[in-house]
Amino acid sequence: MFPPMWRRLIYHPDINYALRQTLVLCLPVAVGLMLGELRFGLLFSLVPACCNIAGLDTPHKRFFKRLIIGASLFATCSLLTQLLLAKDVPLPFLLTGLTLVLGVTAELGPLHAKLLPASLLAAIFTLSLAGYMPVWEPLLIYALGTLWYGLFNWFWFWIWREQPLRESLSLLYRELADYCEAKYSLLTQHTDPEKALPPLLVRQQKAVDLITQCYQQMHMLSAQNNTDYKRMLRIFQEALDLQEHISVSLHQPEEVQKLVERSHAEEVIRWNAQTVAARLRVLADDILYHRLPTRFTMEKQIGALEKIARQHPDNPVGQFCYWHFSRIARVLRTQKPLYARDLLADKQRRMPLLPALKSYLSLKSPALRNAGRLSVMLSVASLMGTALHLPKSYWILMTVLLVTQNGYGATRLRIVNRSVGTVVGLIIAGVALHFKIPEGYTLTLMLITTLASYLILRKNYGWATVGFTITAVYTLQLLWLNGEQYILPRLIDTIIGCLIAFGGTVWLWPQWQSGLLRKNAHDALEAYQEAIRLILSEDPQPTPLAWQRMRVNQAHNTLYNSLNQAMQEPAFNSHYLADMKLWVTHSQFIVEHINAMTTLAREHRALPPELAQEYLQSCEIAIQRCQQRLEYDEPGSSGDANIMDAPEMQPHEGAAGTLEQHLQRVIGHLNTMHTISSMAWRQRPHHGIWLSRKLRDSKA
């Protein structure tokens, strides 16, 4: 379709995204300019901002249904804002009512939750338009603007053939390449584990996050049966198989050292890892740039590994590397998944409205707390505008809404970027307004600035805010010729809005990740227990095994993300976090063992029933000991609960099989985690959620 150079340019993620966002903004302005209605064309540019926040450009099997819902909510919020303000209803009451009513969308699902800030932004934009036009005009702008936004994005995705999904899959393959290369380079290096493991954990976290993102995109497109979707589904299944075999670990450093001393295994293992990583990067480019993959083989590399494994049959490292690299090579050579499974067997269903409403009305509902926090912040912002005698405090309200993110760390970063970017943008715009640039040149510069801002938006929000601020100032200059009067008040409004958002995040029902560490650790242990049950069952099936393996990886990822965010939160006990960091490291080892055991169970390398039952009982008792240590304050304060002792596994005659070795190491890690949590508990905070004596009382 395109020559190679243009293909790399047009399919580049940042360029493709910037072109799409710039065209959907600027085409209505161009049409308005040609028709002599530049004002309406510029007002249309308000609607894509609401649609972007609502995620209405997300490829979805119910794309147009979501579009209708979004347009209806935007128009309804705009109408209610104008009518209630005309009845002299105080603005804080209006914003509180809208926020609390729309907050139920968060109970329906993460994609529906985006409708809350988008609808509130539509109401805030209406504040700036009220008094300048009839009541029906903002409604028409939102309805037609959303329709235009939806049709343009549908046409764009139809032309570029599911480009957002291709971008996610390409990033996943590239992350797997980096992870494989880094992991097997450390396998043969004498590196301090405390320094070597954190970078690997970060790469593993990114890979699992991308897998979750790809799965959500696949689910949202699951109604499609076209060839492109089926090809993307197959590529995603291959990525799951690759991640499964790349992320396994043997954890026998002594055996690795013996094999390295007796053979040239170090060079061969690194050769295999680098070959796999290079091929994954080529496949990442093929996916992104719509190219068919070329033929691939790594027979020489696998042959060298097989020779080492044959020459050293008593060393498990050679067999381990040969077995997993041969599976990886098979996927890369055949371009087919290792086994058949129903990837979408576990359907994600949104909660029906009435059960969602019932859950939302509970005081323990995170969605209700988030809506309450946002309503208080917006009310304070509107009262601040009244105290400063601002006729319309829409800029303070908009700043609060745009910088408030899910979590302390993300909100703090967004506040810094937004405030600095706005200040720089206002200074540049103030200087530029003195030059009295003609309208045609002004529109051209606005187009270039918008394109440049979207090009860097994903990587540098602060610099993108500079461009958006300049464009906003010139939009007001073209609409109402008051751009210079706008600069200083908007600077003050931005600072006030950022301060309100920061205060609300810290003091209004804060959801500290440090307070969720126990719950997330408990959930991860439950996922591990269910995975071990499936692995040691009499007839493990591939699809349930695959799903539970991903749940295990995602549960550990949630725990790891909580720990990282907790370490950035203010005034928290660093000794407790240091202990929990060690706990999470052992949790990662268990995940790697479960990944390895899943492949063994799928190939029916099972233990004898009596031995499997014995190991299952030992693992369950060890997991329950860890859970009880997390749940209760201290031994003896748990009432009727029984803090169980870990059983001693009796050694069996004969050499233990690979599966049995993994199970023994899992039990060892669980015992270590129990000891760590016993020490960490003494360092815990003594306030807030930590005053709950039992974990299940604070799970909501």
UniProtKB/Swiss-Prot annotation:
It is found in: Cell membrane. Signal peptide: none annotated. InterPro entries: Integral_membrane_YCCS_YHJK, Memb_transporter_dom, YccS_N. It comes from the Bacteria. The keyword Metal-binding does not apply. The chain crosses the membrane at residues 24-44, 67-87, 89-109, 115-135, 139-159, 383-403, 420-440, 461-481, 491-511. GO terms for cellular component: plasma membrane. It is a multi-pass membrane protein. The keyword Iron does not apply. Keywords: Cell membrane, Membrane, Transmembrane, Transmembrane helix. It holds the Pfam family FUSC-like. NCBIfam families: YCCS_YHFK. Belongs to the YccS/YhfK family. This is Uncharacterized protein YhfK.
